[in-house]
């Protein structure tokens, strides 16, 4: 067996019959499997012990040798080797075929490799292989030439003989006729009778002449065919072929079936054929050249790889080990067997029958029929159903062939190699664990005991609770009391991994420290729900146990939930307070006027009646007042604080040298807000405002911004502790806020009827106008939709105004905990317009609210939209999953390989936007809208200089938030940044071009699998995207949006209703031609005009931005008209541009930007933030290859797709050797095509079209260098990413003294961060790897 860690590459090739015999331990001669009485394998059958090994360990078949001491002996009675029974998983047999057969993959695959090699059409091949026609395999030209005159003379003689025979026959018949006539005359017959006899004789003589002519024509045909006979000539006429064989078998060979194909391959000269094809390619053109190119690919593949093409025709077929196609006894004494056994039995039966027929010397037609059946049975074994009807088993179920075992989701690749089931795992329902800390999960005791069983048993023996493992096992099974104590020890500091399916991104698996809980449900921390997309309505999660010390360390350092607070897609926090917690924090930080709620302890300024009230000397005094009931939590107060840092403006004013703990300042705030600020680290500036999750405002503070800021300024451990405190406070105060929903909380508008009556009247007017023909159907529809939308808005606004602030429903919405105002409108106002199943509005709105209840008709109208929503969601989930799979596949080998590739290239991205005043003058600069997703977290590729030419930031600087602010202040509009699109690393990317990891905020580590993170970041929000195609009132047809648009872009498909783009800059001239326009661009440079014909009017001309004449700084949007100016790459019609056109006209950079903008447009429309770098990684993979136009002196074939980095290398070698470089054209490939074009055949085969990929790889003798992740998972190696790359794998750990000391000062979770220990300034949660080693 192969040692899994020893090889560096895996090659696949064509096996010849000799290889198959060499692998085999014996020939399978009988179709029998096992004896039904003894249940032992039959000798020489498909389960034979002599060939495949013993069924029992160390025991031969007859029982003469038993026990391990006879190891290696071959029993002289039964011939079975005494060894372990597991050899039955490894040993192969073979079947010697009585006639050769072709391998169906090479004959029936598209394109047919056999057909291309032999230059035969697949239809003809089919006829030859399945005994429908004969083919000439070789012709002895010399002998035919030298004997031609003799043969021709013989032929002429034969023709003369035929003519002479015919003449004599005719003469005989004429004689007989005369005799007959004489007899009739003598008998006195009438003329009529004589005429009949005459006519019959004439007819017969005519027959003789025709027969002779046919015979002569046949001889002519035989002769002409023989004269022109050439190899690979097909003869479909069976009789003609028999005639040729009878007469001239010494001069040629031929036949039908795989034997003739084998003969052709043996006579085939690869080098001569390749030479000839290259000649055609260089000198030919059109179809002939294209065919020669395709053929050369196959011929050159055999030449290069050294594969023997004879391997495509088999004389022996391998029999796979019996344990891989087992036969098991079921309860009722019946047997269940693998389909392969049935397929093998068919092959053996037919093969044996064919052997017997050949021995008996059966007629050729019977033998050929049997050979055809043998060919069909081998085809069914290799790939059932590829040709003709599939072979079926019981119940008409097609049998699973060898190909089917590899293909698809249930195939070997995806089911067993990429997706194995693992030990040490369990699953259960999840419930909320509000008492947990962020890095903990609650594990049911019974589940933990089962998972940690071996650890518990070991400790029971170590602690002398049990004498040996066996008794320890018994103790665990009986759940003795001491077992629980030992279990507590075993699980302490041993993280477990929790996973929730579907795992859409890497945060779908996180590590937690287990805490034992009663019951049978896993308890999950509420803040971890967002990342898992989990809720507690019956969701289940799986638990996995990292076993080795390295695995535990990785789980703790990389996967612990408290280290995964930020999203890898956008860098925004995922572990955010939500639902009840938000309500609680909102309630805690609300401020209400003293009259409304606050009691006598609220702040009142000094007046003539007395001094100011509600000023407290310390937080403790304020809490005392609250406890006594004289001060409300939300009442405005003044409190003197000395343990919390003041807000930035107060600090700047009162403490110019910076505030130190203990210095006092007066806070104008509420008691609740002080309590909230106590949750935050003590040196975090005081936050004065209402905490909300979404929907900002002047006095509102977004929780997300707070968490973001914390993550940027503090170590993760501090952030995690703060989040936990927020969670606790949120739950505590939401419980005390009394926010609940009752029917009485849903207030109903008193004057809704009056409002709606006004709109009803307007709707009636529209209907009247329509009935009188003053409006078209479309205008009526548009006006009614607008009218009722206005009605819904007015009613909704009235509902919002009706609700007081302390009503629980607006509290829930305003805090951002759940829902939105639209839902309140629906509950208490009116539902409004709904769509039908086509996606058009129903012109009757739903006028009732859910509180009042819908009428039957309204309920029916509403059900359309709801049903569409559910169907959409189901389709979207499947589509989104498939998109993620394709993205992962195309980007899986993009790994950060090096620190810096040293390139000076980059891409320009906008940083600052001008702020204009009313006159259009620039008054300052503000951040560009897209900074978050395009600029932040990158590295400058060139110096950023301001208008005066001074360097603000040097090349190589990281663009942090502070640095971006510097650029904006300096008024720098755009900068050149490093990007993966311009990275020069041949495989993977470099850390500088990638920038910072969004999940950590630090520069990305070497070994990070950024490709997969990119794929997950794009795929994970896929389910949120709509499936909609937007209707545009008949103009331009449907515009594809949402998920289908993203797929269309990544697959580089030509969009439906695609818009042509201008290939030159110039002025346009329009001609109207009925339903179409003809658009001409007159170029500025004076070159030839460019004409675009047949531009659809229905699609409509594109819009353009034109400066206003009245106002210099302003622009208006309008459609293109005569005389407008267009720039290169500008769209001429509405609709999406074709990426292939963009590549051709705007080049590589143009299409990169086009794809990024278009993909981001879809995600932004749904409010999803994804960093550009993720999309760039996918685009880099799509643009990696080019088509060879001229091969120069390189090895490439014209028309083939090659990796541009490989081509660059080959070109420099060619130039170095004084040759010509290859000429290439950039190509854009869809992600599916790009995945299949990968260098790794293992990765491509496990993705799609498995048989096609393997066929191609075998012919080319492809070698897989095992660079990507999938191929290493398949063969069971550590993946070459993360800690699996050699840089980390081959480390010898010797900590320095400094690192050893630092190790003891790492803060633990329990240490307080809020005390006076100065710990807040601490900046490193753990020792960096580089220092530790």
UniProtKB/Swiss-Prot annotation:
InterPro entries: DNA-dir_RpoC_beta_prime, DNA-dir_RpoC_beta_prime_bact, RNA_pol_asu, RNA_pol_N, RNA_pol_Rpb1_1, RNA_pol_Rpb1_3, RNA_pol_Rpb1_3_sf, RNA_pol_Rpb1_5
PANTHER family: DNA-DIRECTED RNA POLYMERASE, DNA-DIRECTED RNA POLYMERASE SUBUNIT BETA
Cofactor: Mg(2+); Zn(2+)
Molecular-function GO terms, alphabetical: DNA binding; DNA-directed RNA polymerase activity; magnesium ion binding; zinc ion binding
Domain of life: Bacteria
Binding site for Mg(2+): 535, 537, 539
Details of cofactor binding: Binds 1 Mg(2+) ion per subunit.
Family matches, as HAMAP family: RNApol_bact_RpoC
Keywords on record: DNA-directed RNA polymerase, Magnesium, Metal-binding, Nucleotidyltransferase, Transcription, Transferase, Zinc
Ranges in coiled-coil conformation: none
Reactions catalysed: RNA(n) + a ribonucleoside 5'-triphosphate = RNA(n+1) + diphosphate
Positions bound to Zn(2+) 2: 901, 983, 990, 993
Quaternary organization: The RNAP catalytic core consists of 2 alpha, 1 beta, 1 beta' and 1 omega subunit. When a sigma factor is associated with the core the holoenzyme is formed, which can initiate transcription.
Record-listed E.C. numbers: 2.7.7.6
Function field: DNA-dependent RNA polymerase catalyzes the transcription of DNA into RNA using the four ribonucleoside triphosphates as substrates.
Name the record gives this protein: DNA-directed RNA polymerase subunit beta'
Residues involved in Zn(2+) 1 binding: 60, 62, 75, 78
Gene3D superfamilies: 1.10.132.30, 1.10.150.390, 1.10.1790.20, 1.10.40.90, 2.40.40.20, 2.40.50.100, RNA polymerase II, clamp domain, RNA polymerase Rpb1, domain 3
Protein family membership: Belongs to the RNA polymerase beta' chain family.
GO CC term (a single one): DNA-directed RNA polymerase complex
């Amino acid at each position: 067996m192969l040692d899994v860690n020893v090889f560096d590459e895996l090659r696949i090739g064509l096996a010849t019959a000799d290889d198959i015999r060499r692998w085999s331990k014996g020939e399978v001669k009988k179709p029998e499997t096992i004896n039904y009485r003894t249940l032992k394998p039959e000798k020489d059958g498909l389960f034979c012990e002599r060939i495949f090994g013993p069924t029992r360990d160390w025991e031969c078949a007859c029982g003469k040798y038993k026990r391990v001491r006879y190891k290696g002996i071959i029993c002289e009675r039964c011939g079975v080797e005494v060894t372990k029974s597991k050899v039955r998983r490894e040993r192969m047999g073979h079947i010697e075929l009585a006639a050769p057969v072709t391998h169906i993959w090479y004959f029936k695959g598209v394109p047919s490799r056999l057909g291309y090699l032999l230059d035969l059409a697949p239809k003809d091949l089919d006829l030859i292989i399945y005994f429908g026609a004969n083919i000439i395999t070789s012709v002895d030209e010399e002998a035919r030439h030298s004997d031609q005159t003799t043969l021709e003379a013989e032929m002429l003689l034969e023709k003369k003989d035929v003519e002479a025979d015919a003449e004599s026959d005719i003469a005989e018949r004429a004689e007989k006729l005369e005799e007959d006539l004489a007899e009739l005359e003598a008998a006195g017959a009438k003329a009529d009778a004589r005429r009949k006899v005459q006519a019959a004789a004439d007819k017969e003589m005519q027959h003789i002449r025709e027969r002779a002519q046919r015979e002569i024509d046949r001889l002519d045909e035989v002769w002409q065919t023989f004269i022109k006979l050439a190899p690979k000539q097909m003869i479909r006429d069976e009789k003609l072929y028999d005639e040729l064989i009878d007469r001239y078998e010494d001069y040629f060979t031929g036949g039908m079936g795989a034997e003739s194909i084998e003969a052709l391959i043996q006579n085939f000269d690869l080098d001569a054929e390749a030479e000839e094809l290259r000649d055609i390619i260089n000198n030919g053109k059109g179809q002939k050249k294209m065919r020669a190119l395709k053929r050369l690919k196959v011929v050159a593949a055999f030449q290069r790889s050294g594969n023997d093409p004879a391997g495509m025709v088999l004389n022996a077929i391998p029999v796979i080990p019996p344990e891989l196609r087992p036969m098991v006894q079921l309860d009722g004494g019946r047997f269940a067997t693998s389909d392969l056994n049935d397929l093998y039995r068919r092959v053996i039966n037919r093969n044996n029958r064919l052997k017997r027929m050949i021995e008996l010397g059966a007629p050729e037609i019977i033998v050929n029929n049997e050979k055809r059946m043998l060919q069909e049975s081998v085809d069914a074994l290799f790939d059932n159903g590829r040709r003709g009807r599939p072979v079926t088993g019981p119940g008409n179920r097609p049998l699973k062939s060898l190909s089917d075992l590899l293909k698809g989701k249930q195939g070997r690749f995806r089911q067993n190699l990429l997706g194995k089931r693992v030990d040490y795992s369990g699953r259960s329902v999840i419930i909320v664990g509000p008492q947990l800390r962020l890095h903990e999960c609650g594990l049911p005791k019974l589940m933990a005991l089962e998972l940690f069983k071996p650890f518990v048993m070991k400790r029971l023996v170590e602690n002398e609770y049990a004498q040996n493992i066996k008794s320890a096992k018994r103790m665990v099974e009986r759940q003795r009391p001491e077992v629980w104590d030992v279990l507590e020890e075993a699980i302490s500091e041993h993280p477990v991994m929790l996973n929730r399916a579907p795992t859409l991104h890497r945060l779908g698996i996180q590590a937690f420290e287990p805490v034992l809980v009663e019951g049978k449900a896993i308890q999950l921390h509420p803040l971890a729900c967002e990342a898992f997309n989990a809720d507690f309505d019956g969701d289940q999660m799986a638990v996995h146990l990292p076993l080795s010390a390295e695995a535990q360390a990785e789980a703790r350092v990389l996967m612990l939930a408290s280290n995964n607070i930020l999203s890898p897609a956008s860098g925004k926090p995922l572990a955010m307070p939500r639902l009840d917690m938000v309500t609680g924090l909102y309630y805690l930080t609300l401020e209400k006027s003293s009259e409304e709620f606050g009691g006598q302890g609220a702040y009142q300024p000094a007046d003539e009646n007395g001094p100011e009230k509600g000023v407290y000397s310390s937080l403790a005094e304020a809490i005392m007042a609250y406890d006594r009931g004289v001060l409300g939590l939300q009442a405005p107060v003044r409190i003197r604080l000395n343990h919390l840092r003041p807000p930035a403006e107060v600090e700047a004013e009162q403490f110019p040298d910076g505030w130190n703990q203990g210095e006092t300042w007066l806070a104008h705030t509420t008691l609740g807000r002080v309590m909230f600020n106590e949750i935050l680290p003590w040196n975090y500036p005081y936050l004065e405002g209402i905490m909300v999750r979404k929907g900002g405002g002047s006095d509102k503070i977004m929780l997300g911004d707070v968490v973001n800021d914390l993550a940027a300024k503090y170590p993760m451990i501090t952030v995690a502790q703060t989040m936990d405190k927020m969670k606790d406070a949120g739950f505590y105060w939401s419980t005390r806020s009394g926010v609940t929903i009752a029917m009485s909380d849903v207030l109903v508008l008193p004057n809704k009827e009056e409002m709606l009556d006004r709109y009803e009247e307007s709707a009636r007017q529209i209907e009247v106008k329509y009935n009188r023909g003053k409006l078209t159907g479309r205008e009526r529809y548009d006006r009614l939709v607008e009218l009722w939308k206005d009605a819904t808005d007015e009613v909704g606004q009235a509902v919002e105004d009706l609700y007081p602030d302390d009503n629980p429903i607006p509290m829930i919405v305003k805090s951002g905990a759940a829902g939105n105002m639209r839902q309140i409108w629906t509950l208490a106002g009116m539902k409004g317009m709904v769509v039908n199943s086509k996606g058009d509005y129903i012109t009757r709105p739903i006028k009732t609210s859910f509180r009042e209840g819908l009428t039957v008709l309204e309920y029916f109208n509403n059900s359309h939209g709801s049903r569409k929503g559910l169907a959409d969601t189901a389709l979207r989930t499947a589509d989104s999953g498939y998109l993620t799979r394709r993205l992962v596949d195309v980007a899986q080998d993009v790994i950060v390989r090096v620190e810096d590739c040293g390139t000076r290239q980059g891409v320009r991205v906008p940083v600052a936007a001008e702020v204009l005043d009313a006159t259009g003058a620039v008054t300052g600069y503000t951040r560009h809208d897209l900074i978050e997703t395009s600029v932040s977290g990158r590295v400058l590729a060139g110096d950023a200089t301001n208008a005066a030419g001074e360097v603000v930031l040097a090349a190589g600087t990281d663009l942090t938030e502070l640095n971006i602010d510097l650029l904006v202040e300096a008024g720098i509009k755009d900068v050149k940044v490093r990007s993966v699109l311009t990275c020069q690393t041949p495989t993977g990317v470099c850390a500088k071009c990638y920038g910072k990891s969004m999940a950590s905020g630090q520069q990305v580590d070497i070994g990070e699998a950024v490709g997969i993170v990119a794929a997950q970041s794009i795929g994970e929000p896929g389910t949120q995207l709509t499936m909609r195609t937007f209707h545009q009132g008949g103009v331009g047809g449907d515009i594809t949006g949402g998920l289908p648009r993203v797929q269309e872009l990544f697959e580089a498909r030509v969009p439906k209703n695609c818009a042509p783009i201008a290939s030159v800059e110039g002025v346009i001239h329009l001609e109207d031609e009925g339903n179409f326009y003809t658009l001409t661009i007159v170029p500025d440079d004076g070159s030839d005009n460019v004409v675009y014909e047949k531009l659809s009017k229905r699609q409509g001309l594109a819009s353009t931005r034109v400066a206003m004449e009245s106002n210099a700084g302003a622009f208006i949007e309008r459609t293109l008209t005569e005389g407008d100016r267009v720039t290169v790459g500008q769209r001429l019609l509405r609709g999406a541009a074709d990426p292939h056109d963009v590549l051709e006209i705007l080049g590589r950079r143009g299409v990169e930007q086009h794809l990024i903008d278009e993909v981001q447009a879809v995600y932004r429309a749904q409010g999803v933030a994804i960093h550009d770098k993720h999309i760039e990684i996918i685009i880099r993979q799509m643009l990696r290859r080019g088509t060879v136009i001229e091969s120069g002196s390189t090895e490439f074939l014209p028309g083939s797709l090659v990796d541009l980095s490989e081509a660059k290398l080959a070109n420099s070698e060619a130039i170095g050797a004084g040759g010509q470089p290859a000429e290439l054209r950039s190509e854009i490939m869809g992600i599916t095509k790009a995945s299949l074009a990968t260098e790794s055949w293992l990765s491509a085969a496990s993705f799609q079209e498995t048989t096609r990929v393997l066929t191609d790889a075998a012919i080319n003798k492809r070698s897989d260098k095992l660079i990507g992740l999938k191929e290493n998972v398949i063969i069971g190696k550590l993946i070459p990413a993360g800690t699996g790359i050699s840089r980390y794998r081959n480390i010898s750990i010797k900590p320095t003294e400094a690192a050893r000391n630092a190790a003891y000062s790492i803060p633990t979770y329990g240490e307080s961060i809020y005390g006076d220990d100065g710990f807040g300034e601490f900046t490193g949660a753990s020792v960096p790897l580089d220092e530790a080693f």
